[in-house]
């Protein structure tokens, strides 16, 4: 898996780092990349790194989250609240402010986000006196090797783990077992199909998440309702 990094102005400045970099330097090298920190992403990783940074002596000025509600486990969110770290939901990072010679970060601009996570003009807020922006906005699958494998071997190349989707270790193990049966089929080796179905069911069940019901869903405007819609059929019962 590779980090997902949202696009914002000056996102390539020294001082803008992903949680993986921040944690590695802090936990393995015992080094802080900054004393005053802004965390982007109110999920488990954002909560955990903010908590660890505070324990290491840093000052996390805030955690900003573009969605209207917090992510992650409530126990993790409550832990950073007890440390006095504010969690600002409905805000997106607009800009990292560089120092005079563009060698570090000295501030950031955040703004309220609309339902497409775009900044709303006129709602900008300035956050000053920070040296580090800690990006904790999740991961995306790293499927480059899988793509190359399929180009060479076709459908006889099977993906597992984070090459397929981001999930927990249990899901990766189950997908690995499922792929093993698929390899046996490619080799024309007999196996118990009931075992394959059982593993497949476990794997699919491990992907299921409760359906989130939106109190105020984003609906199309009347003008959009009067225009044609593209209808896509779902071929599979899972994604």
What are these regions (language model features)?
Residues 1-239:
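Residues forming the flavin
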């Amino acid at each position: 898996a590779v980090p997902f990094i949202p696009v914002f102005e000056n996102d390539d400045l020294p001082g803008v780092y992903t949680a993986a970099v921040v944690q590695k330097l802090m936990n393995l090298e015992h080094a802080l990349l900054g004393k005053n920190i802004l965390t982007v992403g109110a999920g488990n990783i954002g909560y955990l790194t903010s908590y660890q940074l505070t324990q290491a002596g840093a000052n996390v000025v805030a955690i900003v989250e573009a969605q209207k509600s917090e992510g992650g486990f409530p126990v993790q969110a409550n832990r950073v609240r007890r440390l006095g770290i504010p969690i600002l939901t409905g805000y997106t990072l607009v800009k990292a402010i560089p120092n005079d010679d563009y060698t570090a970060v000295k501030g950031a601009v955040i703004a309220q986000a609309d339902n497409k996570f775009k900044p709303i003009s006129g709602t900008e807020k300035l956050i000053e006196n920070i040296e580090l922006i800690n990006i904790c906005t999740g991961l995306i699958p790293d499927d480059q090797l899988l793509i190359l494998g399929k180009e060479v071997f076709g459908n006889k190349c099977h993906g597992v783990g984070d090459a397929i989707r981001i999930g927990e270790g249990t899901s990766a193990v189950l997908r690995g077992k499922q792929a093993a049966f698929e390899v046996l089929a490619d080799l024309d080796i007999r196996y118990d199909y009931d075992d394959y179905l059982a593993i497949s069911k476990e794997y699919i069940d491990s992907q299921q998440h409760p359906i989130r019901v939106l109190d105020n869903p984003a609906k199309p405007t009347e003008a959009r309702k009067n225009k044609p819609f593209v209808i896509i059929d779902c071929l599979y019962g899972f994604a």
